[in-house]
Swiss-Prot record:
Task performed by this protein: This protein is involved in the repair of mismatches in DNA. It is possible that it carries out the mismatch recognition step. This protein has a weak ATPase activity.
Tagged with keyword Cell membrane: no
Name listed for the protein in its UniProt record: DNA mismatch repair protein MutS
Lineage start: Bacteria, Pseudomonadati, Pseudomonadota, Alphaproteobacteria, Rickettsiales
GO biological process: mismatch repair
Keyword DNA repair attached: yes
Keywords in alphabetical order: ATP-binding, DNA damage, DNA repair, DNA-binding, Nucleotide-binding
InterPro entries: DNA_mismatch_repair_MutS, DNA_mismatch_repair_MutS-lik_N, DNA_mismatch_repair_MutS/MSH, DNA_mismatch_repair_MutS_C, DNA_mismatch_repair_MutS_clamp, DNA_mismatch_repair_MutS_core, DNA_mismatch_repair_MutS_N, DNA_mismatch_repair_MutS_sf
Amino acid sequence: MNFQEFKHKYGYDAATKMMQQYLDIKFAHLDCLLLFRMGDFYEMFYEDAVLASGVLGIALTKRGKNGDEEVPMCGVPYHALENYLTKLIEENYKVAICDQLETPEEAKNRGGYKAVVNRNVTRIITPGTVIEENLITTAEPNYLASLVVPKNKDTAALCYADLSTSTIFVVNVPELEILNELARLKPREILLSEHLRSSDLASNISKQLNFRITYQVDSFFAVNKCEKIILDFYKMKDIKGVGEISNSQICAIGSILEYLTLTQKENIPNLPKPKIIDFHSYMTIDFSTRRNLEIVTNSCGGNKGSLLSTLNHTVTKQGGRLLYNFLSSPLTDTHKINQRLNITEFFHSNLDITAKVRELLKKTSDIERCLTRITMNRGSGRDLLSIKYTLETANSIKEIFFDNYGFELPSFIEKIVKPLIRNDELYNLIEESICEDAPNNLNDGGVIKHSYHPKVLQLHDLINNGKLHIEKLKDQYKKETGIDSLKISHNNVIGLFIDITAKNANKINDPKFIHRQTTVNSVRYTTAELQKLESDLVNAKTLVVSLEKELYEDICKRVTKQSDYLRILASSLSGIDVFCNFAYIASENDYTRPEFTDDLSFDIVKGRHPVVEEALNKERKSFVHNDCHLSEAERIWLITGPNMAGKSTFMRQNAIIAIIAQIGSFVPAKSARIGMVDKIFSRIGAADDLIKGQSTFMAEMLETSAILAQSTKNSLIILDEVGRGTSTYDGVSIAWSVLEYIHDKLKCRCLFATHYHELTIMDNFLPAMQNYTIAIEESGKDILFLHNIIAGAADRSYGIHVAALAGLPASVINRAEQILLKFEKNAAGKGKNILSTESNNLSLFAIESPKLQNSKLEEKFKTIDPDKLSPKEALELLYQLKSNFIKQ
């Protein structure tokens, strides 16, 4: 829609000047909800009002007319804006904040009483650009990402930034891994080029991952333009100052910086240069595996029951974010993993230090986000106080280490403790300038200490002692004039004035006394001093707030110069918090340090699933531990056994142990020897992808296909029930061939659970595969699941027993047992296994499907025509059927 069409639609020419101003600004921000400041409210009009009233649950009213139609309107109080913004951001809306740039009085002075207050958009808030604490509802990073996919190349460039913590990264991502990488980062907003709008990639990002996409014209990502943006932003002359980056990475970085500049207007973020990430430096975990293993969220998208919720006993917000990043990105460099494990072991071996440090960490603040708000002019005195208190506490934490170890601290601990040394210059600046009870809002005043600046002291003295100053001036004038009856009074017409009786008027000879008014009984004067005092008294509150703002801005600039120091300090505190957390969890839950090898070992003794164990502990139940011994010689475990016996839990727990080990934590096991895992794939269950029109079987086959295509020798594959959802023969065939492919081609570690017992014979010709099953105890028809993994193969799945536990009607259970018995007799007569190893050309379809015989009741029903029965005959037949049913 062009501007002329827009003007016609909204009746621009007939609108008031204020509404024309609104429409001008709205046209420039058509992709945003426009919140338009009018006095004490932010108002919305037309479609914005209708949409916002529904989302926010506020009343929809009217304001004026557009032709014959009333204009919808709704509004929110300015002081409650952030509460409403939270809801809009949660719903992924883009919001433009239009503020008044002058007061109504200033507008009148500028253009008369009909003048419209100047307004303009001061900020655009999007899900990926929020920095306010109450707008960021989770402890995870709040990433804005830009994805650049060059044509005819198999690698994309991804830049991602968390504005709230002033961090920015760039990485080259293999094309096949784009969705997996986005699933790792979970960005709140992704910038994409317009030409990708109809692509499968955009569709998958939007529908499968459910991430917000903001499309930009193709020129937004032009390499020459983006390079200039980077150079200007970082005040560099050569792009090599960022590092060795490709043209695609230049486009990704430049587009993010441009978007941040456009949305933040004058408040340009103080971002460091992008950190270049090596894609292969962390474990690949695809989208489905993250969901199946419930690493950082549960299957419903919440936190409860996730691995993160179990492991997260951090005591700071920045520590929680770092743990989230650790779990999202386990390392693949064993040297770096062992460096982390060394730190964890130090805290685990010094639990007294750990306990003291954790108590002090609770007193620190999220100074990363405090610093961002300060540098972007959205901070408060409390943010500065938070930094001061954290500096003080960090120094106390440092002293704990040196009091216990002196100069004998291990080098890897000294490295993370060294940044805790207090920056006295910064500490003293805040200590001397900011009031301990500073309000959040600068407009309330009381942020700057009176003693920090003489003018502040003077103004507060005026505010608090105005009457005293008037009395002092009165006494001075009495002495100068010799008039003891001289008074200083006030009225609403002439303000403060010197009042003397008429008979004393002849004593006023000094020209500094300026005549103001004569009455019957008195003469009134003023002086330049009195006028200044009156002006100062009237304007003192306004002046002190204005002066405090100036001083506050100067203090913030000086604090911003210490950004590098504060970021290093924040990083140190968050790291200490995470490693103390690892030590705490290990001591509370009997975790042990894993050992890393250079082979395909995966030797876990008495391993446990941490999330399930935590849930059982709350019920005062014990978790049944299990071993897992994968190696070069025994890479594949084929696991058979009953439903509900714990196969899926066992497989998940081993994948989770690998993840926990490679983030640098101790693991829930008696011992663990692990060859580094570069990728984990888990296909355990799948829901129908109704959006894409895919069945459960199709979804599972797509996942399995991706696993086989992307796995390497160092990968760990977890597969459960491959081949289900189709005919038995098809399913067995697929599962068989997948096992062969993993064994012969990929040669990686794999846990493979199945109900196809025919597969158990494959250990005869797949030397690196072994059969394992779940131990049970049978007593008559009763079955006890022991949850122990033992060598061997199961010959039954006990599905009917599980169905009975689920509460299926007894008649259904009895009928199922009858049918199962017929199947088993039929199978016994034709050979136990559907598959045979006698021939390389396996006869998969040699056995016909058993046919079920109809019961006598079913045969009887076939002979009945209800329309030909009289009521009496129908009743007699009902009794007869009941009698036969009881006999059956």
